[in-house]
Design a protein with these regions (language model features):
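Gly/Thr-rich phosphate-binding beta-strand-loop-beta motif of the actin/hexokinase/Hsp70
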Residues: 2-26, 108, 141
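Short glycine-rich, Thr/Ser-proximal phosphate-binding strand/loop in the N-terminal lobe
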Residues: 19-42
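Short, basic/hydrophobic alpha-helical segments
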Residues: 40-57
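Short alpha-helix plus adjacent loop in nuclease-associated cores
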Residues: 81-120, 133, 140, 175-176, ...
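Short, charge-rich amphipathic alpha-helices with coiled-coil/heptad character
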Residues: 114-132, 183-186
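Glycine-rich, often acidic, oxyanion-interacting loops/wings at catalytic, nucleic-acid
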Residues: 134-230
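Phosphate-backbone recognition surface of nucleic-acid-processing proteins
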Residues: 230-233, 239-240, 244-328
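Low-complexity, acidic/Ser/Thr- and charged residue-rich accessory regions of DNA metabolism proteins
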Residues: 317-399
């Protein structure tokens, strides 16, 4: 490690698994020094970071390894800043530069001297990073549990074992599965199937205990803020989903509008057509792919509960799915999008959610409750079967 030049005003840090490449620039924009930081000895790394000028901006890419490095930089009195990896790559390609460790560090150090912050992304504080870690850990456990349940279903399908349980993994269903796994005389399940089923059930029990432990920890450590209470007032949003949304969003105020939050949540429709005279999209509109997939999952998951609850979100779902008869996945995405926009509005205005807000003075629009009542009256007049959105079959005269 080289001796630090005190005239440096900005630094670029290209972080890798075992080392980092550093480029420092002075006030004239010239390179003050370059060096390579080894990550093996953390104490030696901290001592060297302490020699850097305090308060100096250090720019890192928002990719692998930025979290722990930002913590080390903050402890050393430096000012870490995150740059969008996608924008840095586009800038490098526009300048015709080949990708290398030194090139990336040089480009990042140039960003620190620019007054325009087009490249900067939000750096979540430590409490938000901790919240994300807890919620993602629980999500990973639930995902493993779902995968094991699907494998148990596959075992029953392969052996032709049918059941009429609404929830196979409820108390009655688990008793049936336990009997199958322990009954060596049952001819419908071979020995290999019994051993596999028994192992899966043991893993499910272990996962269920782990999920219960982490859920209690989440409720104990995560503070119930006024913002979390407002989110839980939305239809379909419970405590876990509320904390998941807060963990991924961090601060609603960092988004300029509900459209920006929807785009970040991968729910905003966008078109990829050019040269059209109108705003129509012949190839159709699709959601984006650059954002928080966890947020997209959370909003759509809340959309399922909001549709079951009814109200204006059920009205949105029915409008785009013809009463739930076609393209239901698209309907849930639209409801999730509407929930996202509503959450942004109540967070910015710091108000509680109302299912039937009063109409603005002079507005001719009816409230959500009135629209829901009218929808139910229309469905009843059409003699439709409740819960399906489909009409009753016509009566056929016999004889």
């Amino acid at each position: 490690m080289k001796t630090t030049d005190r005239t440096a005003v900005a630094m670029g840090l290209d972080v890798h698994r075992q080392f980092s490449t550093v480029t420092a620039r002075n006030a004239e924009g010239k390179i003050a020094w370059r060096e390579r930081l080894e990550h093996e000895d953390r104490d030696d790394l901290r001592k060297h970071l302490a020699t850097w000028p305090r308060g100096m901006p250090v720019i890192l890419e928002s990719s692998f390894g930025w979290e722990w490095m930002c913590e080390e930089l903050e402890q050393a009195g430096l000012e870490p800043q995150l740059a969008s990896s996608r924008k840095v790559a586009a800038w490098r390609n526009a300048r015709g530069m080949a990708k290398s460790n030194r090139t990336d560090a040089d480009l990042l150090s140039e960003l620190g001297r620019q007054t325009d912050r087009w490249w900067q992304v939000w750096l979540p504080p430590p409490e938000v990073r901790d919240r994300r870690e807890w919620m993602r850990y629980r999500m990973s456990l639930v995902g493993l549990q779902t995968g094991l349940k699907n494998r148990v279903h596959a075992i029953l399908h392969r052996h032709g074992i049918l059941h009429d349980f609404a929830d196979l993994f409820g108390a009655p269903g688990r008793r049936m599965l336990t009997r199958l796994a322990n009954d060596a005389k049952n001819p419908r399940l071979r020995e290999s199937g019994r051993a596999t089923l028994k192992g899966y059930l043991q893993l499910l029990d272990h996962l269920r205990r782990q999920i219960a432990v982490v859920t209690r920890t989440i409720y104990r450590h995560l503070r119930v803020t006024p913002q979390a209470k407002r989110l839980q007032g939305l239809p379909g949003v419970g405590p876990i989903l509320a904390h998941t949304i807060l963990a991924e969003v961090g601060d609603f105020g960092r988004f300029r509008s509900a459209r920006h939050l929807s785009s970040y949540s991968l729910l905003a429709p966008r078109a990829f057509d050019t040269g059209e005279e109108t705003d129509e999209a012949p190839k159709g509109r699709h959601v984006g792919h650059m954002g928080r997939r966890t947020l997209k999952w959370a909003w759509i998951e809340a959309g399922h509960g909001a549709v079951r609850r009814g109200g204006r979100f059920r009205e949105v779902f029915d409008r785009y799915t013809d009463g739930g008869k076609q393209n239901r996945n698209r309907g849930y995405i639209l409801v999730g999008h509407e929930l996202c926009r509503t959450a942004y509005a109540i967070s910015k205005k710091e108000t509680e959610y109302r299912d039937d807000p009063p109409a603005r003075p002079g507005s001719s629009k009816k409230g959500a409750a009135s629209r829901e009542h009218a929808r139910r009256r229309r469905a009843k007049s059409q003699n439709s079967r409740p819960g399906t959105g489909q009409p009753d079959p016509p009566m056929v005269a016999v004889g």
